Amino acid sequence: MCMSVQTKVAVLKWIHHLFINIPHKMFNHIENLFPILMKSLSDNSDEVVQQTLVVMAEIISSKSPEAAITDSNAEMQNKYFTKFIINLLRIFSADRHLLEERGAFIIRELCILLSAEDIYKTLAEILLEESNLSFARTMIQTLNVILLTSSELFDLRNKLKDLESLVSILYISCIFNYYFKLCILL
């Protein structure tokens, strides 16, 4: 069955609407929706990919109790955030063409919808464990280009430039510790 771009976008907007208005009911269906949404990231249409990211951002940033977990630092986190990033990296690893052609678009859109710092930190943590060094190197190069050239990451670049405060220094050492380790390894 082949759906038009408009139909796909309309379905994604409806799913987004449902997650906003009745998240407690929608989280009962997340295990079925998650793989379908991940597959939609490979769609040829930018509009479909963009709307898929809007839905995923709603899911992975939800404060709904169904999505919450407590990490080792006793902070509440959304359990789907890391799951999404891991699956995104798997998709990029399996489909290098998607990474090369759409990877920057997907990462930039995520940085608009969510915290760029959280995205980069989580990507770095996961890539540190990546056994395929060729993929890790390609992904790091992609992330570097995005960080250096993307207007969506202007605030993050400014934070990295401003090393005058203790908070900035701690930010660099904590957030990008994993990222720098990966760069050194490669």
What are these regions (language model features)?
Residues M1-I30, N73-Y80, F92:
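Alpha-solenoid helical repeat scaffolds
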Residues P23-P35, Q77-I86, E100, A116-Y120, ...:
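Core helices of alpha-solenoid repeat scaffolds
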Residues L41-D46, S62-A67, A74-F81:
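Secondary-structure transition/capping motifs at alpha-helix termini
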Residues L113, E117, K121-L186:
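Long internal repeat-built scaffold domains in very large eukaryotic proteins
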